[in-house]
Amino acid sequence: MNNCSAFFLVGPTASGKSTIAHILAEKKGCSLISADSMNVYRYMDIGTAKPLVHERGKINYYGIDVVDPTESFHVAAWLDAIKPAWLEGSIPIVCGGTGLYLKCLTQGLDSFDNENLNKRDLLNRKSLNNLQNYIK
């Protein structure tokens, strides 16, 4: 996702981001990328602020209804699902509040600092008993 421009509309839950983003995308004729980790799941429409089906016909949405709730999903798959948004020729609007998605989109997947990765690797090699003693 290097050198891909986007407009971002981010903020807390239930702050009206989705409605504003849809209106802007419709007026500007651009696509909309959902950066909400729950919107990727099909059939989970209640409480997720997904656009209604008739709204989805007006503009192109990415990152919505990507997998079934029984399937595993990770941020790399989300990045793959939204890539086509940049092929449309306009700058997409990224809307949502899932920090991991936003961080990986703006800083890349390899942006996690090595210190934490080294700590994780060290802890993964410890036994359950050692880990329990570690957190006491």
Name every feature range the model reports, one short phrase each:
Residues 1-136:
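Phosphate/pyrophosphate-binding catalytic cores of soluble transferases and nucleic-acid-acting enzymes
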